[in-house]
Amino acid sequence: MPVLHNRISNKELKARMLAETQPRTTISFYKYFNILNPLDFRNSLYQQFTDLSVFGRVYIAKEGINAQISLPTHNLEAFKALLYSVDPALDNLRLNIALDDDGKSFWVLRMKVRDRVVADGIDDETFDPSKTGEYLKAEQVNQMLDNPDTLFVDMRNHYEYEVGHFENAIEVPSDTFREQLPMVAEMLQDNKDKNIVMYCTGGIRCEKASAYMLHNGFKNVYHVEGGIIEYARKAREQGLPVRFVGKNFVFDERMGERISDDVIAHCHQCGVSCDSHTNCKNEGCHLLFIQCPECATKFEGCCSEMCREEVRLPETEQRARRAGRENGAKIFNKSRHRLQDGLNSTSLQSVE
């Protein structure tokens, strides 16, 4: 029986990926459709994806599939043929090709079965996710941005919005999609006569959000087809003004795609203009924050003095402390809230 999960260490896999000389292409895709047996579906796909040297993150649920992957560029056409043949619902599925890609986005294939492909927290039997808002193509997006009766709503996390967003877009200040859904319906309760345009990175969150808004009585609901990635690609191809400002955060090793030259965020430690996310080098912390090159040097890639001191300890001692043998789980504060504490303030959001 073939092995249907990885058995090689992350360290070795990453080293192999970095040593690769063949070009790789990073793509993302999703589809809401009915999967009767997600585990069987997953196991079949895992072997076929492995045969094509696919790396990345794939979530499968009864409601569909959500994937961010990379693969050797010469395997792209074979991958399309495979994906389109898996189920009629996936025939000619749109693939979002990364905008700013060095091919080093992933180094291992992780394919998981989940309850939902996007954790939405919706527990309402009357909710129909197939009743979604209207798609907007790039030219229509730009027209809507100039319409005073239209509100653009960013359905991404706060740290994504911080480094880039559409002009005048509304932020729904939360760390999770499940929190955002009821929040945005409440925030816009007095704007049901407006056009509501929802967007996210690749389309999967805003598609479900548009259905949620319609379910809650909003009438004129739209979502950006293919999300930020497809919008920026089509706008460039068609010679349209790109109205997304800054960087598009992505959940892989790149941590961002440059959409415009604007840098709209600031280093969380010193406040200088910067939009480069990193994870704290302390493995017991691993917090996501924005850090400029100067602070990266000063703090040795860490979010605080405490974490810098931690990474200087022998590795065996660090592992013991992470296991809680010395001070338990309170050694590091993994709060999701930002701290404003002088030089060492940081956004304490972990990518998990």
Curated annotation (Swiss-Prot):
The active site is at 200 (cysteine persulfide intermediate). Signal peptide: none annotated. Residues 146-240 form the Rhodanese domain. SUPFAM superfamilies: Rhodanese/Cell cycle control phosphatase. PROSITE patterns: RHODANESE_3 (PS50206). Residues 315-352 are annotated as: Disordered. Keywords: Oxidoreductase, tRNA processing. Disulfide bonds: none annotated. Gene3D superfamilies: 3.30.70.100, Rhodanese-like domain (3.40.250.10). GO terms for biological process: tRNA modification. InterPro entries: Rhodanese-like_dom (IPR001763), Rhodanese-like_dom_sf (IPR036873), Rhodanese_C (IPR022111), TrhO (IPR020936), TRHO_N (IPR040503). Residues 315-328 have a biased composition (Basic and acidic residues). HAMAP family: TrhO. Belongs to the TrhO family. This is tRNA uridine(34) hydroxylase.
